[in-house]
UniProtKB/Swiss-Prot annotation:
Pathway: Carbohydrate degradation; 2-deoxy-D-ribose 1-phosphate degradation; D-glyceraldehyde 3-phosphate and acetaldehyde from 2-deoxy-alpha-D-ribose 1-phosphate: step 2/2. One of its GO terms (biological process) is deoxyribonucleotide catabolic process. The gene is deoC. InterPro entries: Aldolase_TIM, DeoC, DeoC/FbaB/LacD_aldolase, DeoC_typeI. The keyword Cytoplasm applies. It comes from the Bacteria. Keywords: Cytoplasm, Lyase, Schiff base. The lineage of its organism: Bacteria, Bacillati, Bacillota, Bacilli, Bacillales. This is Deoxyribose-phosphate aldolase.
């Protein structure tokens, strides 16, 4: 298994400097990760640096709270795609989901999906640590209904990250044709393999190099 091609090599800390982002880009070239996942302000740089390399440019929308308006999320999506993003990880409106406003949640996702159509993959972050199992299932069902390419566990900025149990539940809910991304707290090769075994088709990690090299020390970041 080429585990590197399942990893979004991630740097999303608010205090990340250009040198931190460049380090991630260079590592992505070296190890041929699926993508680099960076904050929107770095998308143009990453797209320029990764031109000609088989590494996608992934960024985040409505991040990390998901509480932006739909119009803002749509604007962000169009803006980052224009700057070179080929994958976007959007955060759902968690409060609306908890209120049972499924129509709003689906519309919020669908409008981002439509803004990205044919230009970028859309991964929907449901923030599993804040949800009941019933809400996790509902969030996944609404994501599929809205046309998302992936569902994703976590931002890495809330109270918890990916668990194998959540991945299994998400995979069971979305079926075989929608991706499932495990993110938050995946720090070692063993962590990554557990997630893949449970049904993950993508891993979000900042410890990507340690995972590929099977370096047990891993990393300490939540993401």
């Amino acid at each position: 298994m080429n585990i590197a091609k399942l990893i979004d090599h991630t740097v999303l800390k608010p205090n990340s400097k250009k040198e931190d982002v460049m380090k991630v880009i260079e590592e992505a070239k070296k190890y041929n990760f699926a993508s680099v996942c960076i904050n929107p302000t770095w998308v143009k740089l990453a797209a320029e640096e990764l031109a000609g390399h088989d590494v996608d440019v992934c960024t985040v929308i409505g991040f990390p709270l998901g509480a932006n308006t739909t119009e803002t999320k749509v604007f962000e999506t169009k803006d980052v795609i224009a700057k070179g993003a080929t994958e976007v990880d959007m955060v759902i409106n968690v409060g609306a989901l908890k209120d049972g406003d499924d129509e709003f949640v689906e519309k919020d996702i669908r409008e981002v999906v439509q803004a990205a159509k044919g230009k970028a993959l859309v991964k929907v972050i449901i923030e599993t640590c804040l949800l009941t199992d019933e809400e996790k299932v509902r969030a996944c069902e609404l994501s599929v209904k809205a046309g998302a390419d992936f569902v994703k566990t976590s931002t890495g900025f809330s109270t918890g990250g990916a668990t194998a149990e959540d991945i299994a539940l998400m995979r069971k809910t979305v079926g075989p044709n929608v991706g499932v991304k495990a993110s938050g707290g995946v720090r070692t090769r063993e962590d990554a393999e557990k997630m893949i075994e449970a049904g993950a088709s993508r891993i979000g990690a900042s410890a990507s190099v340690a995972i590929v090299l099977n370096d047990e020390k891993g990393a300490t970041d939540n993401y």
